[in-house]
């Protein structure tokens, strides 16, 4: 039997779904999703320490060496007794481990035609990093039967909407490798009208003009 994993984000529309799952489902949290989830098996903080340094210093309530979050973020992560995946080990977080970026790139990276000797991963969000690691482990024998998604929406009209195609790309790669994808009820992921069936006209941006098409 393979593992069952649930990726948890902070979107309140579907974050509740994680708590409805049985205890044998691994809970992979990210960033500040500890505000919506009660247990975790792994954690992910992929941002650089000085993430958006200029912006966070302007806000005053954030600090530049805390991954663009409030100072208590590092304090909370420092108390976790589960692996905390990061770009680099943080001495303030005893459970921090380095995300195996090079190994995953070598195994799963795409080959850009302009740089055929440099495999590159398609990753536009922390959730994508999490899915890539799950696929990497699955293909290396630590198999995954089910991948659940909770609190990860990336809805159109939000700053995260540009990250949605990448998450759906990795879900597709997992599905193609035999993993069952289980979505929370009413999620925005993998959901859209059927082209030429559910509507008569293609989606059209009302603000589209020849000038802004470039």
Where are these regions (language model features)?
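Metal-ion/cofactor- or nucleotide/acyl-coenzyme-handling active-site neighborhoods
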Residues: 1-214
